[in-house]
Amino acid sequence: MAEKFDNLEEHLEKFVENIRQLGIIVSDFQPSSQTGLNQKLNFMITGLQDIEKCRQQLHDINVPLEVFEYIDQGRNPQLYTKECLERALAKNEQVKGKIDTLTKFKSLLISELGKVFPEEMAKYKAIHGDDPPS
């Protein structure tokens, strides 16, 4: 899978470099540079065809639209991954806190119910085990 991405990256780098050179030729166009311009245009077409071939190999890859928004805003797309991981970590900590609170509540509830309803709690503990989770 990595070689597919490497192949695409290589073709994209070549394409961008060709476009850069094409821009230089066009910005200072002289009739004598027509042959070079035609050659660069043909390279551009070939580059697009190569990229299209790579696209067909990567058709099953899904990229979140937010990544493209980051790129459009001039931001590093790796920041998207970092921020997603940070949000997941924060949510994980929040859920862990809720679980810990509910576990403590269950333990306290079992303890208090044992004081009020000792016979019923003895049956409960016989079915579910003597040690409530703490």
Curated annotation (Swiss-Prot):
It comes from Danio rerio (Zebrafish). Pfam families: Med10 (PF09748). The keyword Disulfide bond does not apply. GO terms for biological process: atrioventricular canal development; cardiac jelly development; heart development; regulation of transcription by RNA polymerase II; Wnt signaling pathway. It is found in: Nucleus. Component of the Mediator complex. One of its GO terms (cellular component) is mediator complex. Its main location: nucleus. The gene is med10. Keywords: Activator, Developmental protein, Nucleus, Transcription, Transcription regulation, Wnt signaling pathway. This is Mediator of RNA polymerase II transcription subunit 10. Component of the Mediator complex, a coactivator involved in the regulated transcription of nearly all RNA polymerase II-dependent genes. Mediator functions as a bridge to convey information from gene-specific regulatory proteins to the basal RNA polymerase II transcription machinery. Mediator is recruited to promoters by direct interactions with regulatory proteins and serves as a scaffold for the assembly of a functional preinitiation complex with RNA polymerase II and the general transcription factors.
